[in-house]
Amino acid sequence: MNIYDKVHELANELKECEEVKNFKKYKKAVEAKESSKKMVEDFRKVQLQAYSEQMEKGAASQETMEKLENIGKIISMDLDVSNYMQAEVKFGVLWEDIIKILGKAVDDDFVDHK
């Protein structure tokens, strides 16, 4: 068994995986429409702001949480953005699982045991 052959096999499987296909498809759809692209960027900014506040103060401000909620409502009305966000989460779970499996194969210290 050649390890590189197996890695290429995994790469080919990933290309055909529904999570990857959907993520790429919806990302392309969002990037093709400026308003959708801006919506995702705005959401990311507020999401980062909420995370920063949570790290600094223990919780995000009421104002930031309201912004997140409002952007979430707007996102749910844009099918491309909504599909993209869902596909991104599913891909993220898949990717995290793959990294955990590979980490365990090499050394248990690579895996975060939260």
From Swiss-Prot:
SUPFAM superfamilies: YheA/YmcA-like. InterPro entries: Com_YlbF, YheA/YmcA-like_dom_sf. Belongs to the UPF0342 family. This is UPF0342 protein NT01CX_2274.
